[in-house]
């Protein structure tokens, strides 16, 4: 969870952070 601002939101969506902003662990 590199981005605490949108980490919990993207994790809920399903690892969208990969191409959302940066790499985040689901």
Swiss-Prot record:
The entry's localization annotation reads: Secreted
Keyword entries, A-Z: Cleavage on pair of basic residues, Disulfide bond, Hormone, Secreted
Which InterPro entries did the record assign?
Somatostatin, Somatostatin/Cortistatin_C
Q: List the disulfide bonds.
A: 15-26
Cellular component terms, GO, for this chain's entry?
A: extracellular space
Its job: Somatostatin inhibits the release of somatotropin.
Protein name listed in UniProt: Somatostatin-1
Q: What is the native source organism of this protein?
A: Amia calva (Bowfin)
